[in-house]
Amino acid sequence: MSNKDWTGNTNSIFKTLGASNHTEKERQNEDYYATDPEAINKLITKYQLPEVIYEPCCGEGHLAKRLMKLGHTVIATDLIDRGFGKGGVDFLKVNKMPENCKCILTNPPYKIALQIILHALEILPEDGECIMFLKTTFLEGKKRFQELYSKCPPVKIYQFSERVMCAKNGDFETMIKGGGSAVSYLFMIFKPHNKNLPTIDWI
């Protein structure tokens, strides 16, 4: 298996995408938090990831690069072009999965994380999986329960036993100088049409 970022024909996969509006770009630009690749190292101690993974909110590639080093083929896109993957792709307007890919893994912008999960479940195949890095507080919320958890709960929840750094605009140096992370995170794994309650473990 080759380590590679996706450089295929964007027109064939995302041909129905329209131009993203300025408000959407501003929103995500202000909601960009790069994830410490150690999050992937922790996840793979308990969960086996598939060979091909779609990372639709790739940022500067912190998660994607780690996955590639582990031997995965990563299709990396983002609404904002931050110098990695394919920029200018609004995931909420993507209408099908990349070829031979059944897994979406990302740290979505928190303000639209619910919409991203719901959309991922719409475009994934029946045997696909949606792996989301989220704040632990994402577990609560009336709207999330009504629109997501009551209809398609996660199959697995992996709670981090130690704090993981997510640095605004990828500035890990400033975050470390400030004492690291004060926020709790987890991975949620969803599968389309799941009705069973999740199992929880710690990583």
Positions of PLM-derived features:
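Class I S-adenosyl-L-methionine-dependent methyltransferase catalytic core
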Residues: 1-203
